Amino acid sequence: MAPPKTASELPVRSFASSADWEAWLAAQPLTSTGVWLKLAKSASGIASVSKQEAIDGALCHGWIDGLVHKFDADYWLVRVTPRRPKGKWSQINRARALVLIKLGRMQQAGMKEIERAKLDGRWKAAYASQSKSKVPDDLQRALDRNPSARRNFDRLDRINRYAILYRVHDAKRPETRAQRIKRYVTMLSRGETIHPASRSRNPQRLVK
């Protein structure tokens, strides 16, 4: 099975070990645009770099993992690319990067990305994953003042809930954050969501 058409220009590679994977990363030129990395499924019995090893290697060399797709009966594909100049950091990757530094594994390219993120504020502004995200106090207060919005927020699926929390967190200025909170509370009070429900499902309708 071929990789997704949207990124079919990237090479598809597999590596038997984390050492092979990191050696490949270290040899990549600055002009590299990324790779579709093949990760063998556990039941395949094929020697392969694991997903965590793939992520660790990417972080150490200033790269980042992304989309995951099915490849065939034995492999998954994960898209791994150099981190973009203003690419956001997740709290999970930030914490893992600190572990890799303590272990002495972080490479120069990876440290440069960390230093850049610290200088421009992206390191401090790292976002929580969907499973770890919490409702901030200012959003909670706004919801509490609007019972209809609060009720509909509590009924959101995890995708729509995280969509709001992420966008509020991602606001760069206090006034932008306040505007977003106001907009989402108004949206919720009308029973609307950021991501409409799939037509293939019949979810419970949000009510005012």
Q: Which residue stretches match the model-derived regions?
A:
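Charge-dense, helix-prone N-terminal extensions
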Residues: 1-208
